[in-house]
A protein has these predicted regions:
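A short, structured loop/turn motif at beta-sheet edges
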Residues: 25, 57-59, 83-89, 108-117
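Hydrophobic pocket/interface hotspot
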Residues: 28, 38, 64-66, 82, ...
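Hydrophobic/aromatic beta-strand elements that line small-molecule binding cavities or substrate pockets
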Residues: 19, 53-56, 78-84, 95, ...
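Hydrophobic ligand-binding cavity/cleft-lining segments
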Residues: 1-48, 171
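Beta-strand/loop substructures that line and gate deep hydrophobic ligand-binding cavities in soluble
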Residues: 14, 92-143
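Intrinsic-disorder/low-complexity, polar/charged segments enriched in Ser/Thr/Lys/Arg/Asp/Glu/Gln
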Residues: 12-18, 51, 63, 77, ...
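A conserved amphipathic terminal alpha-helix motif
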Residues: 123-171
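Short beta-edge strand/loop motif at the mouth of beta-sheet-based domains
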Residues: 16-17, 36-75, 161-170
């Protein structure tokens, strides 16, 4: 059975997503911070999109850039910088691609009994910015986080293979 995800709009500008993963926090954290692992779960498979480029320098001041595309369509980009990186427990980054100003995402990874409670808190610069993002995002987010859970379980089942050394799938 899939782990339950909750999505809650906390205010006009805040969105909180929670999800439990069937893997320890260090594995889930690595999957969020290593480009070779991000490539394996970040894009919902049903979207028909491919991750064309994936850069993540997960350190304070480091930058990330994810570029998605499909065929002849114009690629979409998500990019920003890491504001806080506490290994295996917390990530904070900016989202600088929006037309409404900069959003900030905080993700916490709390390990409980070998599983990870992930809480993702997005703070948008305006109500309009969150309105633009929230429509239709829950299904894609659910699929993406299910893919992350599958990857984390696979990585956890191979304890001799550190997540950072995992071989990425062909893009």
């Amino acid at each position: 059975m899939k782990n339950r995800m909750t999505v809650e709009r906390k205010s006009e500008r805040e969105l909180v997503v929670t999800r439990v993963f069937d893997a320890p926090a260090h594995i889930v954290f690595e999957a969020w911070t290593k480009p070779e692992l991000l490539r394996r779960w970040w894009v919902p498979k049903s979207s028909g999109l491919s991750l064309l480029s994936c850069e993540a320098d997960a350190r304070v001041g480091g930058k990330y850039r994810l570029v998605f595309g499909s065929g002849a369509s114009k690629p979409m980009e998500f990019y920003g910088r890491y504001v806080e990186v506490t290994p295996h427990s917390r990530l904070v980054w900016t989202n600088e691609e929006g037309d409404h100003g900069e959003a900030v995402t905080t993700v916490t990874f709390d390990e409980i009994g070998g599983k990870t409670l992930l809480v993702m808190h997005d703070l948008y610069p305006s109500k309009e910015a969150l309105d633009d993002v929230i429509a239709g995002m829950e299904g894609g987010m659910r699929e993406t986080l299910d893919q992350l859970d599958e990857l984390a379980v696979t990585l956890g089942a191979n304890p001799g293979r550190h997540p950072a050394g995992a071989t990425p799938d062909a893009p």
